[in-house]
From Swiss-Prot:
It comes from Prochlorococcus marinus subsp. pastoris (strain CCMP1986 / NIES-2087 / MED4). NAD(+) binds at residues 15-20, 114-116. Its main location: cytoplasm. Its EC number is 1.17.1.8. This is 4-hydroxy-tetrahydrodipicolinate reductase. HAMAP family: DapB. Gene3D superfamilies: Dihydrodipicolinate Reductase, domain 2, NAD(P)-binding Rossmann-like Domain. Belongs to the DapB family. Keywords: Amino-acid biosynthesis, Cytoplasm, Diaminopimelate biosynthesis, Lysine biosynthesis, NAD, NADP, Oxidoreductase. It is found in: Cytoplasm. GO terms for cellular component: cytosol. CDD domains: DHDPR_N. The gene is dapB.
Length: 282
């Protein structure tokens, strides 16, 4: 563990050897106002190895640890009297993200969560826990500024369209469907309350689920998983005589890093849970 000697935000990265985690490590190492203090990953064969050497990144003395709990405890003690509090960035797995986030809050460390798959009940539990602990916690389904703008546009347009379909496409290593980003988009559309996609005919499906998953509001969501994709979302709205399509493509994980760094810098100003990058940038 490294003790922060400057006025920088101490950052722990959980899932540090993964695709997103390694990008976060690189961005933190190259940031002037953040400092990497712990790199946690479940890959046991790399335990104790230097993170910079493993990922061929800017020099750092941080060693990979398999022990999230131990890292949280140690960093919490190291910075208990510091004005700038540590932040845990989590890009792990839907099966572990809830416990990881809860543990960080328990140790007084603000979580910035990019892992999707949290249920509404889990998010509500974390919100209550964060508020009681007086700790900022950010649940961010998508760190792309472009995606946030898509969601804002879709939310505004929903007032004018009764028929809306959402398509989300990701690489075939993504575990959860639909994506947290797409769920967030649907929730923002549903802020204008009405029943969407009311059928004018009696529909039948010769292949079950071919029309996609249907939310209580009537919004249809279609999930695609293919090699060669990264992260893509399309919102298609239709009315007589026209369609309106909003599309966002992420072609490199670097697109997420400005949003991640913004969340790291700002979450310390909050004392409760926030959901969505728009809460930080607008």
């Amino acid at each position: 563990m490294i003790k922060n000697s400057k006025k920088t935000t101490p950052v722990l990265v959980s899932g540090a050897l993964g695709r997103m985690g390694s990008e976060v490590v690189n961005s933190v190492l190259n940031s002037s106002d953040c400092e990497l203090v712990a790199a946690i990953d479940t890959n046991k064969k790399n335990n104790g190895e230097n993170i910079s050497q493993l990922l061929n990144l800017k020099k750092s003395d941080v060693l990979v640890s398999n022990d999230l709990e131990g890292s949280l405890c140690s960093i919490s003690q190291d910075y208990r009297n510091e004005k700038i509090k540590p932040v845990l960035v989590d890009f792990t797995h839907p099966d572990s993200v809830y416990e990881n986030t809860r543990s960080a809050i328990a140790y007084g460390i603000s979580p910035v969560v990019g892992t999707t798959g949290l249920t509404p009940s889990q998010i509500n539990d974390l919100a209550i826990f964060a508020q009681k602990a007086n700790i900022g916690c950010a649940i961010i389904p998508n760190f792309s500024v472009g995606m946030v703008l898509l969601q804002q546009a879709a939310s505004v347009a929903a007032k004018f369209y009764d028929n809306i379909e959402l398509i989300e496409m990701h690489h075939n290593q993504k575990a959860d469907s639909p994506s947290g980003t797409c769920i967030k988009t649907a929730e923002m559309i549903e802020e204008y309350p009405k029943k969407y996609n009311q059928s004018l005919v009696e529909e039948s499906e010769s292949l079950k689920g071919v029309r996609g998953g249907v939310r209580d509001s009537g919004l249809n969501i279609h999930s695609i998983r293919l090699p060669g994709l990264l992260a893509h979302q399309v919102v298609i709205m239709g009315s007589p005589g026209e369609t309106y399509t909003i599309k966002h493509d992420t072609i490199d994980r670097k697109a997420y890093m400005p949003g991640v760094l913004q969340a790291i810098r700002k979450i310390g100003k909050f004392n409760s849970l926030i959901y969505g990058l728009e809460k930080l940038i607008f």
